[in-house]
Amino acid sequence: MGNIVAVIPAAGMGSRMGTEVKKQYLKLQDRPILAHTIDALEQVPDITGIVLVVSPGEETLCQELILKGNLFNKIMAVVPGGDHRQTSVYHGLCSLPGDTELVVIHDGARPLVQRAEISHIIKEARRVGAAALAVPVKDTVKLVNDQGYVIATPNREKLWAVQTPQVFNYELILKAHQDAREKGVYATDDCALVEALGQPVKLVQGSYENIKITTPEDMVMAQAFLKRRNCWCE
């Protein structure tokens, strides 16, 4: 079997956070969010390497704020991203060695994912080719038109909120991205690109704590979750 490499897109602007510092560099209990995220992936024995994708021109900043002073052993490269998350992920994919078997794509702003969840999703992806963490939605979801009027209410029992990591066979996800680029298709997650090829994607239930930190409210929740974990460990 080949290598399993993680790609962490961390090139987002973080405008909804409303801070001068980009969200991935904000401190979560005295460490940058991105450092927590890297640490979670470093702890997974199956993952042999990690590629960080940052905003163009921020490679040195990432070295100073994230990598310097942290004992990370699996960082393979820090590469510049693009204008969209999808482009950034593609840049990361193109930097991977040819003997890569599986790719673990994980948002830089999801620092609370746990080792067992990552290991589980890797196992499923190895079996079926594409798998992602997700949780059943708690609220009723409405489909609306451009004017804000409800046009449908999907069955909540069939709706899941997709998270990351999303893990794929390397050749499959690379082909999915290349196909999307040729067709000018943009999606909000990588699973959608694989789905467009007609390939099945397996969802595995994760944790509601695996939030993507996007707003100040998310930061408060992340602090609370992390504090509770630390209390359990003491």
From Swiss-Prot:
Reaction it catalyzes: 2-C-methyl-D-erythritol 4-phosphate + CTP + H(+) = 4-CDP-2-C-methyl-D-erythritol + diphosphate
Pathway field: Isoprenoid biosynthesis; isopentenyl diphosphate biosynthesis via DXP pathway; isopentenyl diphosphate from 1-deoxy-D-xylulose 5-phosphate: step 2/6
Alphabetized CDD domains for the sequence: CDP-ME_synthetase
Site (Transition state stabilizer): 16, 23
Organism ancestry: Bacteria, Bacillati, Bacillota, Clostridia, Eubacteriales
Residues flagged as site, Positions MEP for the nucleophilic attack: 156, 212
The protein, known as: 2-C-methyl-D-erythritol 4-phosphate cytidylyltransferase
Functional note: Catalyzes the formation of 4-diphosphocytidyl-2-C-methyl-D-erythritol from CTP and 2-C-methyl-D-erythritol 4-phosphate (MEP).
Family according to the record: Belongs to the IspD/TarI cytidylyltransferase family. IspD subfamily.
Gene that encodes it: ispD
Organism encoding this protein: Desulforamulus reducens (strain ATCC BAA-1160 / DSM 100696 / MI-1)
Any coiled-coil regions, as ranges: none
Enzyme Commission number: 2.7.7.60
Transmembrane segments: none
Gene Ontology process terms (BP): isopentenyl diphosphate biosynthetic process, methylerythritol 4-phosphate pathway
Domain of life from the UniProt record: Bacteria
Disulphide bridges, residue numbers: none
InterPro entries named in the record: IspD, IspD/TarI, IspD/TarI_cytidylyltransf_bact, ISPD_synthase_CS, Nucleotide-diphossugar_trans
Entries under Pfam families matching the protein: IspD
Any GO MF annotation of the entry: 2-C-methyl-D-erythritol 4-phosphate cytidylyltransferase activity
Record keywords, A-Z: Isoprene biosynthesis, Nucleotidyltransferase, Transferase
